[in-house]
């Protein structure tokens, strides 16, 4: 089962006065539907899930499901380095109607490849909705190897992987081993077209928080044979995408949204305001891309 093709936004969580700003969240969700975003990924890394309480995460996920109301798929971040906690959250998410769950590798524990498989198998066996694996070694210190991914493909609910290793040798090996057994999403906004060329079907995107149409268009154009047009957008966006990762995500994207008047509020500690020199780089990149896109 394919959850979605195209651009799924790794959604920020708007805050106000220290709480989730549900009025702003509703506005953002409806805007994404209008802009052509293909899926919503809520309470992931970009959504600052790690600094939210369990109650806040549940309220935010349920609000998103209710607001979207089946217009596009909603995928909830339910991962944890505690397998039982991931199972509990995934079962709850299934019960309130999410279309799928995004489950990160169990960070910090530094388990083995066997442990990775057993972790995902336990989650797989506890639910009956699609699972998107999330491989991001730069954050977790743990990498899903191609051979482990091949084993994970045999789990009945594992349908896709968000691949953010940036290791294209590994991506080629994954595709060679797994072929069409699993859908492949880019976890890196600067590598969407290269990943699509390896048979990927989309991106789970940070940049889509401010550029939903562009990220959708990259995927849509490429998958409809207009590869040069897709590549042009990808290359035109390179500087602004790089600026969105000049500091730890989601610091720059949330800053960029506020600079654009989207009023998504502050970051929660230990995330903090940008360094002044990096903020200037971000401002310049946003301004330069706006000029380029207006002239196009």
Swiss-Prot record:
The active site is at 134 (proton donor/acceptor), 162 (schiff-base intermediate with substrate). Its EC number is 4.3.3.7. Keywords: Amino-acid biosynthesis, Cytoplasm, Diaminopimelate biosynthesis, Lyase, Lysine biosynthesis, Schiff base. Pyruvate binds at residues 46, 204. One of its GO terms (molecular function) is 4-hydroxy-tetrahydrodipicolinate synthase activity. It is found in: Cytoplasm. Signal peptide: none annotated. One of its GO terms (biological process) is diaminopimelate biosynthetic process. Pfam families: DHDPS. It catalyses: L-aspartate 4-semialdehyde + pyruvate = (2S,4S)-4-hydroxy-2,3,4,5-tetrahydrodipicolinate + H2O + H(+). InterPro entries: Aldolase_TIM, DapA, DapA-like, Schiff_base-form_aldolases_AS, Schiff_base-form_aldolases_CS. Gene3D superfamilies: Aldolase class I. SMART domains: DHDPS. The keyword Cytoplasm applies. The record marks 45, 108 as: Part of a proton relay during catalysis. Its main location: cytoplasm. One of its GO terms (cellular component) is cytosol. Pathway: Amino-acid biosynthesis; L-lysine biosynthesis via DAP pathway; (S)-tetrahydrodipicolinate from L-aspartate: step 3/4. Catalyzes the condensation of (S)-aspartate-beta-semialdehyde [(S)-ASA] and pyruvate to 4-hydroxy-tetrahydrodipicolinate (HTPA). Homotetramer; dimer of dimers. Belongs to the DapA family. This is 4-hydroxy-tetrahydrodipicolinate synthase. It comes from Clostridium novyi (strain NT). The lineage of its organism: Bacteria, Bacillati, Bacillota, Clostridia, Eubacteriales.
